[in-house]
Swiss-Prot record:
Gene: amiF
UniProt source species: Pseudomonas syringae pv. tomato (strain ATCC BAA-871 / DC3000)
InterPro entries for this protein: Aliph_Amidase/BUP, C-N_Hydrolase, C-N_Hydrolase_sf, Formamidase
Classification via Gene3D superfamilies: Carbon-nitrogen hydrolase (3.60.110.10)
PANTHER family xref list: FORMAMIDASE, NITRILASE C965.09-RELATED
The protein's name: Formamidase
Domain CN hydrolase per the UniProt entry, residue ranges: 15-257
């Protein structure tokens, strides 16, 4: 499917998404965090000016906080804090949907790596805490809100995952299973992950008949180098549009969720998300609907264990300078209501 020349030729059923390859910041004070927030607010305005037909502007993971992995309380955000208020107001002012990243204060443990989808009236439509922090490098609390989906612009259904989440095929499958026709993936990845980034963005799309829109931070903060690499993939796994390494570029593409829905209903061969739960339906009525996967049954029972479990070297964050944790996992209540 064509990209509509980056949304310049918008079709009646199209959803135009911009992926912002935001320059990598390095804030260590509240003032620096606020300055970076204002930069993102300015980029929301730029998105609207540069493409009047854009429906949604997506910012990468770490777009406010950079890659320092600092958990300093003075630079953590909250859902009702000034940074989130400013981002919501920007969407409302410029009548555009936005996807934003925050490191969220957690009084019961380590901060959460969280993301929001805000509509063009400034309302939070989706709130997600990263399920799979990039261990052993990242110190964030494991997410505890599942994988939500929300109604998006122009009849789309959106899901949002963060960076390392996309390396687990179960994440994209859950997004699609809950009805998402477009999955957003925001990241701070650096160059060594480039190949894995591309093939997982494509496989996540193809195996779920879902369009994916993915973007990393971009450029250098003097220590780390993020890669940009904005990428749109169609539901058949083909790349529709992609960016390079130019910081602060907004890469745009028109997606067609109506064609995703059509494929999910009408495809026979490679309708994998349906066939996963209806194995061999040519031979048996409705297909086999059991669960033949040992790892799924074990995970559900709290007994997930690899044959080489005892030999795994990295099982905490000590190799990256973090203390061995003593707390067991316990979900943290959220004040946000859908």
């Amino acid at each position: 499917m064509a990209s509509g020349l980056g949304g310049l030729n918008k079709s009646p059923n199209g959803v135009v998404i911009g992926l912002a390859q935001l320059a990598l910041p390095d804030p260590h004070t509240r003032e620096a965090l606020w300055a970076q927030t204002q930069k993102v607010v300015g980029m929301v305005a730029k998105a609207r000016r540069s493409n009047p037909g854009m429906d949604l502007i997506v910012f990468p993971e770490y777009s406010l906080h950079g890659l320092s992995m600092s958990t300093a309380p003075e630079i953590m955000c909250s859902l009702d804090g000034p940074e989130v208020v400013a981002l919501r107001e920007a969407c409302k002012e410029h009548r555009i949907w936005g996807c934003f990243s925050i490191m969220e204060a957690n009084p019961q443990g380590n901060p959460f790596n969280s993301s929001l989808i805000v509509d063009d009236l400034g309302e939070i439509r989706l709130y997600y805490r990263k399920l799979h922090p990039w261990v052993p490098v990242e110190p964030w609390e494991p997410g505890d809100l599942g994988i939500p989906v929300c109604d998006g612009p122009r009849g789309s259904t959106l899901a949002l995952i963060i960076c390392h989440d996309g390396m687990f095929p179960e994440m994209a499958r859950e997004c699609a299973y809950k009805g998402a026709d477009i999955m957003l993936r925001t990241a701070g990845y650096t160059a060594p992950i480039r190949h894995s980034w591309k093939i997982t963005n494509q496989s996540n799309a193809f195996t779920n008949l879902m369009q994916t829109a993915s973007v990393c931070m971009c450029g250098s903060d003097g220590t780390f180098d993020s890669m940009g690499e904005a990428m749109f993939v169609d539901f058949d796994g083909t790349i529709m549009a992609e960016g390079g390494g130019r910081a602060d570029e907004i890469v745009c593409c028109e997606l067609r969720p109506d064609l995703v829905r059509e494929a999910r209903v009408h495809w026979g061969v490679e309708n994998n998300i349906y066939q996963f739960g209806h194995r061999g339906y040519v031979a048996v009525k409705g297909g086999a609907r059991d669960c033949p996967y040992t790892y799924m049954r074990d995970l559900t029972a709290g007994q997930y264990r690899l044959p080489w479990e005892n030999d795994v070297v990295h099982t905490d964050g000590r190799s990256c300078g973090f203390a061995t944790p003593e707390r067991e996992f316990k979900p943290t209540p959220s004040s946000w209501k859908e």
